[in-house]
A protein has these predicted regions:
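Glycine-focused motif/segment detector
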Residues: 1-187
Length: 187
């Protein structure tokens, strides 16, 4: 058991690679959780100049939260409250969302958004960071170490389910943004 992150351990898991990947994520999370308060302070400090540079982002997240949030009994799409949450998630998972302006620029123009894929059993534990387009297309899926691991395979049916739900929530303006985003992605 690693700081309460792993409930049971099977000596012979059916998918050894997925079990290994999940264990590594849990170990990293447990290690980072010890330093969580310090990391939160770092995230606030790191986010401050980004918030100043991209003031629309916080407002955009307030306006899209209900449209893109979704969960079932196993997984959840959780939207950040704003830039500080994205920075903290990037720090905890060790990927690039807090080290580049690219994502905040895309968010501020409604080209794409950063959302979090979590396990419903612990929506506070970072698992995957997704970059999504306004129509629900997933551009990127990244976990610990800026990687995409085999444990994501089990969540793919959920992501397709989420995309169907989101498609039903879109209005005309969202569809126009989705078309523009698709064009920008292919350029």
């Amino acid at each position: 058991k690693v700081a309460g992150c792993i409930k049971t351990v099977s000596v012979f898991p059916s998918n050894l690679k997925a079990a290994h990947d999940s264990f590594l994520i849990a170990v990293n999370y447990a290690r980072e959780k010890k330093n969580l308060e310090k990391l939160k302070c770092e995230a606030v400090a790191t986010a401050a100049p980004i918030i100043k540079k991209f003031p629309k982002v916080e407002k955009i997240y307030k306006s899209i939260k209900n449209k893109y949030s979704y969960s079932n009994d196993k997984y959840a799409i959780v939207l950040p409250d704003g830039i500080t949450d994205i920075v903290l998630d990037g720090m905890l998972l060790g990927h690039c969302t807090y080290r580049t302006d690219r994502y905040y620029d895309r968010i501020s123009t409604n080209e794409s958004y950063i959302v979090f894929l979590r396990k419903t059993s612990d929506t506070e534990m970072p698992w995957y960071t997704l970059e999504i387009e306004p129509g629900g297309t997933v551009r990127q899926k990244r976990t610990f170490g800026d990687d995409q691991l085999s444990d994501l395979d089990e969540a793919m049916p959920f992501l397709f389910e989420w995309q169907s739900v989101v498609a039903g929530r879109l209005n005309k303006s969202d569809r126009i943004k989705a078309q523009k985003s698709k064009i920008l992605r292919t350029e």
